Structure formats: structure tokens, C-alpha cells
């Protein structure tokens, strides 16, 4: 797993069934002293003992944004999930997301800025791809990153570096963080 945009990243395991997802979740859960994004909390414990089922969990009220999805398959899947969860006693309420129009540009600035920092370690010395037969250290860095990253990744790294640079940090990155908080 590679960190792309730490404040936005979320591990999303793909499993055959809910029990496998619960088991994997129990391994991922909890405090890791080597992970600055983890927390130690009893609140988020997950028990698999005694074949616990979803119907026994606390009933939730789930906010569903008034957005509509572009793809019919997404809408159909969401409606099916909503029916199942309502059948288990959970409640859905329609919600408004303020400033949603600014979310894509805010995401792009934050993700690119964090990616430029997170991906800087992939220089061929300790992490990631390494070019063959570099002439010197500068050649190692340039060729490793040129050959190892695709065009879109390079574009995002450059965009993020620009957003974090002196003179543009407040104008782009801090503004994007404020927009994210408003949403």
C-alpha cells in the first residue's frame, strides 16, 4: 500500500463476504505507533465472537447527499444497499452538502500537494523502482522518477509542489483546506 494523499486516503478492502471484511477490519483497526493517522480508542472495537450479525448493531441514521450519481449502476446499487439497511432498522435522511461545487478543485489541490510530499521518497535509493546503470546520483534521481512514474502522477506531483511552494501555499493549499472544512 502506497500513501498518496494521507489526509484523504482510506484503505478499502475487497472481500468475498461480510465476515471476511469484518475479520480484515479487526486486523486494520487500532493504534499503530508507526502510523501517525491511527488512534487508540475502545470506541472502535469490532467483535467477531459468537457470530455477531449486523442486525444486532446499534441503529444508525445515515446521511444521503442530494447529489444523484452519474451512472445508473451506482444509483441502482445504492438503492439496493439502502433497502437492505432500512430492513435492518437503519434510517436514511437526505442531506445538503454546502459548497459541494468547490469539492473537486479542493480535492485536486490537497491530493496533489500531499502526493508530491508522499511520493518524494520514491527516488530509487530506498523505495520503489530504480533505473538501471545510473551515471551519478543526479541521473539516478531523474531517470528513476521519469521512468518510474506515469504522466498523470508526474503532473500531480508538479501541481502539488507548485501549490506548496512559497508564495502559493496560502493561495492554494490553505484555501483548499478551508474549503474542505466547510464541506
What are these regions (language model features)?
Residues 4-10, 33-35, 40-42, 100-106, ...:
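Glycine-rich, flexible loop/turn motifs
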Residues 15, 72, 106, 131, ...:
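Charge-dense, low-complexity intrinsically disordered segments
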Residues 36-43, 60-61, 65-67, 95-108, ...:
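Flexible, acidic loop-helix segments that line cofactor/substrate-binding pockets
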Residues 1-77, 81, 139, 143:
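A short helix-breaking turn/cap at a secondary-structure junction
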Residues 56-65, 113-182:
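Short helix-loop capping/hinge segments that flank enzyme active sites or metal/cofactor-binding pockets
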Residues 74-76, 104-113:
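Short glycine/threonine-rich loop-to-helix capping motif typified by GTGT followed
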Residues 45-46, 72-97, 123, 127-129, ...:
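Acyltransferase
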Amino acid at each position: 500500500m502506497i500513501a498518496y494523499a494521507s489526509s484523504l486516503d482510506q484503505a478499502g478492502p475487497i472481500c468475498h463476504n461480510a465476515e471476511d471484511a469484518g475479520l480484515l477490519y479487526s486486523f486494520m483497526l487500532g493504534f499503530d505507533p508507526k502510523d501517525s493517522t491511527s488512534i487508540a480508542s475502545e470506541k472502535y472495537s469490532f467483535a467477531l465472537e459468537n457470530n455477531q450479525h449486523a442486525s444486532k448493531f446499534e441503529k444508525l441514521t445515515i446521511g444521503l447527499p442530494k447529489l444523484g450519481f452519474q451512472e445508473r449502476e451506482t444509483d441502482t446499487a445504492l438503492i439496493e444497499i439502502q433497502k437492505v439497511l432500512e430492513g435492518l432498522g437503519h434510517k436514511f435522511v437526505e442531506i445538503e452538502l454546502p459548497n459541494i461545487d468547490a469539492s473537486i478543485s479542493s480535492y485536486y489541490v490537497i491530493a496533489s500537494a500531499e502526493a508530491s510530499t508522499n511520493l518524494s521518497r520514491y527516488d530509487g535509493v530506498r523505495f520503489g523502482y530504480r533505473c538501471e546503470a545510473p551515471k551519478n546520483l543526479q541521473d539516478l534521481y531523474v531517470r528513476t522518477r521519469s521512468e518510474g512514474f506515469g504522466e498523470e502522477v508526474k503532473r500531480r506531483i508538479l501541481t502539488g509542489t507548485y501549490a506548496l511552494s512559497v508564495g502559493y501555499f496560502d493561495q492554494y493549499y490553505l484555501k483548499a483546506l478551508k474549503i474542505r472544512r466547510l464541506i
